[in-house]
């Protein structure tokens, strides 16, 4: 998509924040309008995160207009809302390449631009990093400002409160902006969001308070009286003003779509000392009515026709693994009232919408709180229930201690349904599910299963759910299933693999859904093919049998080679003094950038041609 100067005459003048700050203030509303239209035109042609960016146009313009970026440091939490930021910071003409192989990174990324102070992708990290950056700036002595923008979904995470508690203690000069659009990826839940709703009733209190401070600030006795009166008013109007109790000077809420008002407020706050908190109200999907009405559907979009007002329907192909899980969950819950399902704010992505509607009293969206999700599940298990934690591989990393300390050590029957395992694709380095086998395999008493297709996935979910001697994990990928027939549910024998094809000299031990590629390679090389099924416990007997019957072994997995399933096979062979050559094929020792899943697998040699080439080169 080439940039149309005639269509965007004001935006054409802005290819850097320095150019933005040269614009007359009265032209900024027009700039916002053009920026929003350009975002719609670009993302509808290329795909990407959509509704969040539409809601932050005015805020982005105001921040870069008031602050001397990149000298002043602007930090975006998660980064879904940062597309306007990228457009205004020299990446306007490349925005159509976002999330594509070799294109712009899907989130703010330090290696891409000096304006991207913090690389992000996971939520709730901005305030912690911002405090560190603000402290460093203070010690540097260059009067550099620090601003963090965090959403109402991300601020529900415990890490954000840990950071604010620390900021209130050491009092760095920084500004935290809460972008309150009343909508994160899933519906926001929890007491904090109820509290934010209560804050909306405090506009009169906020204006009276700030006005009174200005009028009476020079009169000490009245100033002290105002402070005492304020404490009483605070208790009556806004019970427990949370952010001020944490040590922040709270201002707001203010209209996040009034660019002139935002500029005025930010200028007033820019030179204030200590931790400042600005609460702005925005509308996710602002300016595009279909996204305003359905911001969840329009959170991330494929290519679509903006004039149609709707996203293209799926071609009616095979169901995704998330739906396979969701269907199994509903089927099992209908038969067992003990099932409890937990998600950390990923209802739609994890395939749990139908379950949440059919079984609302057994569905728990704990918000962006992975640590709490796991220990909450532990408590349910202690209480005699059967918790299923549906979580993306990349987000389970955030609750690792809870998996060990609160679940595994106590041998509690918690099942982890690990979605987005392996290569995820367009979201890049921060979202690849590359490490779960490695970080779970070393936990004692953990049972880990890797299905090769959707039927095996269902059987493993059934097996894990009915396993009562400790935690279990079933990991499955993003994307569509393979179209195999679904058979009646039955428990699989724990730790047993299956030989799928008998060959000569070479045996391929496959873990997971690369099985179709492995089957092609086995056929081409006349190799034995094994569906290992279990990463833990491994089928030691079968591994030793394969070692005895073949000249060499190949392990195949879509997980980091280091510490993964293949490493487990190596350990078995060494423990039994079997010096059989083994080639471990999996994800390499670097963070895998964005691109389609197919592009990544081809580049990494994890398609059939690449796997065959790796094996032939190794055997040569």
UniProtKB/Swiss-Prot annotation:
It catalyses: D-glyceraldehyde 3-phosphate + pyruvate + H(+) = 1-deoxy-D-xylulose 5-phosphate + CO2. Keywords: Isoprene biosynthesis, Magnesium, Metal-binding, Thiamine biosynthesis, Thiamine pyrophosphate, Transferase. Binds 1 Mg(2+) ion per subunit. Binds 1 thiamine pyrophosphate per subunit. Its cofactor is Mg(2+); thiamine diphosphate. Mg(2+) binds at residues 152, 181. Its EC number is 2.2.1.7. Pathway: Metabolic intermediate biosynthesis; 1-deoxy-D-xylulose 5-phosphate biosynthesis; 1-deoxy-D-xylulose 5-phosphate from D-glyceraldehyde 3-phosphate and pyruvate: step 1/1. InterPro entries: Dxylulose-5-P_synthase (IPR005477), THDP-binding (IPR029061), Transketo_C/PFOR_II (IPR009014), Transketolase-like_Pyr-bd (IPR005475), Transketolase_BS (IPR020826), Transketolase_C (IPR033248), Transketolase_CS (IPR049557). The keyword Cell membrane does not apply. It comes from the Bacteria. GO terms for biological process: 1-deoxy-D-xylulose 5-phosphate biosynthetic process; isopentenyl diphosphate biosynthetic process, methylerythritol 4-phosphate pathway; terpenoid biosynthetic process; thiamine biosynthetic process. One of its GO terms (cellular component) is cytosol. Thiamine diphosphate binds at residues 80, 121-123, 153-154, 181, 288, 370. One of its GO terms (molecular function) is magnesium ion binding. Pfam families: DXP_synthase_N, Transket_pyr, Transketolase_C. PANTHER family: 1-D-DEOXYXYLULOSE 5-PHOSPHATE SYNTHASE-RELATED (PTHR43322), 1-DEOXY-D-XYLULOSE-5-PHOSPHATE SYNTHASE, CHLOROPLASTIC (PTHR43322:SF5). Homodimer. HAMAP family: DXP_synth (MF_00315). Belongs to the transketolase family. DXPS subfamily. Catalyzes the acyloin condensation reaction between C atoms 2 and 3 of pyruvate and glyceraldehyde 3-phosphate to yield 1-deoxy-D-xylulose-5-phosphate (DXP). This is 1-deoxy-D-xylulose-5-phosphate synthase. It comes from Salmonella typhi.
């Amino acid at each position: 998509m080439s940039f149309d100067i005639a269509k965007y005459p004001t935006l054409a003048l802005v290819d850097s924040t320095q150019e933005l700050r040269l614009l007359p203030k009265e032209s900024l509303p027009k700039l916002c309008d053009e920026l929003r239209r350009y975002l719609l035109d670009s993302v509808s042609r290329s795909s990407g995160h959509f509704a969040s960016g539409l809601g932050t146009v005015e805020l982005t313009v105001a921040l870069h207009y008031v602050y001397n970026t990149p000298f002043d440091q602007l930090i975006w939490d998660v980064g879904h809302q940062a597309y306007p930021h990228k457009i205004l910071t020299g990446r306007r003409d490349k925005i159509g390449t976002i999330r594509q192989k070799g294109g712009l990174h899907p989130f703010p990324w330090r290696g891409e631009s000096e304006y991207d102070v913090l690389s992000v992708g996971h939520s709730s990290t901005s305030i912690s990093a911002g405090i560190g950056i603000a402290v460093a700036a203070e010690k540097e002595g260059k009067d550099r400002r620090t601003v963090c923008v965090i959403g109402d979904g991300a601020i529900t995470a415990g890490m954000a409160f840990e950071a604010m508690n620390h900021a209130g203690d050491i009092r760095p000069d920084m500004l935290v902006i809460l972008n309150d659009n009343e909508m994160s990826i899933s519906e926001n839940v929890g007491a904090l969001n109820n509290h934010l709703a209560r804050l909306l009733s405090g506009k009169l209190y906020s204006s009276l308070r700030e006005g009174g401070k200005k009028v009476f600030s020079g009169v000490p006795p009245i100033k002290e009286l105002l402070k005492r009166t304020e404490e009483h008013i605070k208790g009556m109007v806004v019970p427990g003003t949370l952010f001020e109790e944490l040590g922040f000077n709270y201002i707001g809420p203010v209209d996040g779509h009034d660019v002139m008002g935002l500029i005025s407020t930010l200028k007033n706050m820019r030179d204030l000392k200590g931790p400042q908190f600005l609460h702005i109200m925005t509308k996710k999907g602002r300016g595009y009515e279909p996204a305003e009405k359905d911001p969840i559907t329009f959170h991330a979009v494929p290519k679509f026709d903006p004039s149609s007002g709707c996203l293209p329907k799926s071609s009616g192909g095979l169901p995704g693994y998330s739906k396979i899980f969701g269907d199994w969950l509903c089927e099992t819950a209908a038969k067992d009232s003990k099932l409890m399902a937990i998600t950390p704010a990923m209802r739609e992505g994890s395939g749990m919408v139908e379950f949440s509607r059919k079984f609302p009293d057994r569905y728990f969206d704990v918000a962006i709180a992975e640590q709490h999700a796991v220990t909450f599940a532990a408590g349910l298990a202690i209480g005699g229930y059967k918790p299923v934690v549906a979580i993306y591989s990349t987000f389970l990393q955030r609750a690792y201690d809870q998996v060990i300390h609160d679940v595994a050590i106590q041998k509690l029957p918690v099942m982890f349904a690990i979605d987005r395992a392996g290569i995820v694709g367009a979201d890049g380095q921060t979202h690849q599910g590359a490490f779960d086998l490695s970080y779970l395999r070393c936990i004692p008493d953990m049972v880990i299963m890797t299905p090769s297709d959707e039927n095996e996935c269902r059987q493993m979910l059934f097996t894990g759910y009915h396993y009562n001697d400790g935690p279990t994990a079933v990991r499955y990928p993003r994307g569509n299933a393979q179209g195999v027939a679904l058979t009646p549910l039955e428990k699989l024998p724990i730790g047993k693999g299956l030989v799928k094809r008998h060959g000569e000299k070479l045996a391929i031990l496959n873990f997971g859904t690369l099985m179709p590629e492995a089957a092609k390679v086995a056929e081409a090389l006349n190799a034995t093919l094994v569906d290992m099924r279990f990463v833990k416990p491994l089928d030691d007997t079968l591994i030793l049998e394969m070692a005895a019957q073949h000249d060499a072994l190949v392990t195949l997995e879509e997980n980091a080679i280091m510490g993964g399933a293949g490493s487990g096979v190596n350990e078995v062979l060494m423990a039994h003094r079997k010096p059989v050559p083994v080639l471990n094929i999996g994800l390499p020792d670097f963070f895998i950038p964005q691109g389609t899943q197919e592009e990544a697998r081809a580049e990494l040699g994890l398609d059939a041609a690449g796997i065959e080439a790796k094996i032939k080169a190794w055997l040569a």
